[in-house]
Swiss-Prot record:
Source lineage: Bacteria, Pseudomonadati, Pseudomonadota, Betaproteobacteria, Neisseriales
Species: Chromobacterium violaceum (strain ATCC 12472 / DSM 30191 / JCM 1249 / CCUG 213 / NBRC 12614 / NCIMB 9131 / NCTC 9757 / MK)
Pfam families: PNP_phzG_C, PNPOx_N
Family designation: Belongs to the pyridoxamine 5'-phosphate oxidase family.
Function according to Swiss-Prot or TrEMBL: Catalyzes the oxidation of either pyridoxine 5'-phosphate (PNP) or pyridoxamine 5'-phosphate (PMP) into pyridoxal 5'-phosphate (PLP).
Name this protein carries in UniProt: Pyridoxine/pyridoxamine 5'-phosphate oxidase
Keywords linked to the UniProt accession: Flavoprotein, FMN, Oxidoreductase, Pyridoxine biosynthesis
Binding-site residues, substrate: R9, L10, E11, Y12, K67, Y124, R128, S132, R191, L192, H193
Listed EC numbers: 1.4.3.5
Substrates-to-products reaction catalysed: pyridoxamine 5'-phosphate + O2 + H2O = pyridoxal 5'-phosphate + H2O2 + NH4(+); pyridoxine 5'-phosphate + O2 = pyridoxal 5'-phosphate + H2O2
Sample GO molecular function, one term: FMN binding
Alphabetical GO biological process terms: pyridoxine biosynthetic process
Coiled-coil residue spans: none
Binding-site list for FMN: 62-67, 77-78, 83-84, 106, 141-142, 185, 195
């Protein structure tokens, strides 16, 4: 079957963006855009594409949820034994992408990921719903399983083991991404999009520049 995709396109025209309109700090500017996405009721505004490269040199990507912005770092949580967890142990450099089509915007972030302190992971894990905490024990993430029944059986087993308080599994926790390159993209007519790039400087400040679309 052949698909005709050539004529599928939208014309973007909602807003403009220039380096002069942006805050000096890239993460502060990101928080403004994130809050605007939340206020606009964009579905899953914290969903981001996380791309990583494993020890085999192969890239992989998936959607994960941003769970915090603290001290200039972006936090997310996962199973450390999953494919992405193992990739980040082998190569900590990542690329993140947020796409908010309702606002005709995307944000591209590059940086280095590192595990957060255990107490930070403990605090977030304790805030999760009971069934989600059980799922962190039941799912041997990214490993092949015989059937869905295997997963259901494991969830029931851990539910019996932890009927009330579910401790955080040692193989589950957070990563914090320290960004060094952040690009803000605003869709514009005729594909003449606005792109503003922040680059981290040796003194900890950020430079801003406009990129060709």
């Amino acid at each position: 079957m052949s698909l005709n995709l050539a004529d599928i396109r939208l014309e973007y025209s909602k807003k403009e963006l220039s380096p002069e309109d942006c805050l000096p700090d890239a993460v502060a500017q990101f928080e403004i855009w994130l809050n605007e996405a939340i206020a606009a009721q964009v579905p899953e505004p914290t969903a981001m594409n996380l791309a990583a490269i494993g020890a085999d040199g192969r890239p992989s990507s998936r959607i994960v949820l941003l769970k915090g912005v603290e001290d200039g770092q972006l936090l997310f949580y996962t199973n450390y034994q999953s494919r992405k967890g193992q990739a980040l142990e082998a190569n900590p450099y990542v690329a993140l992408n947020f796409f908010w089509p309702e606002l005709e915007r995307q944000v591209r972030i590059e940086g280095k990921a590192a595990r957060v302190a255990p107490e930070v992971s403990d605090a977030y894990f304790a805030s999760r719903p009971y069934t989600s905490r059980l799922g962190a024990w039941a799912s041997e993430q990214s490993r092949e399983i015989a059937s869905k029944a295997t997963l259901v059986t494991r969830a029931a087993m851990f539910g019996a083991r932890y009927p009330i308080n579910v401790p955080r599994p040692p193989h589950w926790g957070g990563f914090a991404v320290v960004p060094d390159r952040v690009e803000f993209w605003q869709g514009r007519p005729s594909r003449l999009h606005d792109r503003v790039l922040y680059t981290l400087q040796p003194d900890g400040g950020w430079s801003r520049s406009r990129l060709a679309p």
